[in-house]
């Protein structure tokens, strides 16, 4: 393959890891298990966040229908841990956002 062909071949997941996706919870692409690290988010709020994606901004999670005031407070306290990037099919197809089959 020529250099120009090699440059055109990009692994979209590796490319995504070079963004804030690798540093924060990407509300549009991250697996539900990532929310475990923040108190009060897993499993209930994490499921709601994943179910209601995609989001245009981090603050959009505060508009999920049916949230209690306590849930909104927990989300507000964690907004700094979230980011939003474009939905990447390789990360969200099938049921991988709920169960990616990785177990400790």
Swiss-Prot record:
Coiled-coil ranges per UniProt: none
Cellular localisation: Cellular thylakoid membrane
Organism classification: Bacteria, Bacillati, Cyanobacteriota, Cyanophyceae, Thermostichales
Protein name: Photosystem II extrinsic protein U
CC annotations in GO: extrinsic component of membrane; photosystem II oxygen evolving complex; plasma membrane-derived thylakoid membrane
Organism: Thermostichus vulcanus
Stated family: Belongs to the PsbU family.
GO BP term (any one): photosynthesis
Function in brief: One of the extrinsic, lumenal subunits of photosystem II (PSII). PSII is a light-driven water plastoquinone oxidoreductase, using light energy to abstract electrons from H(2)O, generating a proton gradient subsequently used for ATP formation. The extrinsic proteins stabilize the structure of photosystem II oxygen-evolving complex (OEC), the ion environment of oxygen evolution and protect the OEC against heat-induced inactivation. Requires cytochrome c-550 (PsbV) or OEC3 (PsbO) to bind to photosystem II (PSII).
Chief localization: membrane
Cofactor remark from the record: PSII binds multiple chlorophylls, carotenoids and specific lipids.
Oligomeric and partner information: PSII is composed of 1 copy each of membrane proteins PsbA, PsbB, PsbC, PsbD, PsbE, PsbF, PsbH, PsbI, PsbJ, PsbK, PsbL, PsbM, PsbT, PsbX, PsbY, PsbZ, Psb30/Ycf12, peripheral proteins PsbO, CyanoQ (PsbQ), PsbU, PsbV and a large number of cofactors. It forms dimeric complexes.
UniProt keyword terms in alphabetical order: Electron transport, Membrane, Photosynthesis, Photosystem II, Thylakoid, Transport
Membrane topology (UniProt): Peripheral membrane protein
Name of the gene encoding the protein in the UniProt record: psbU
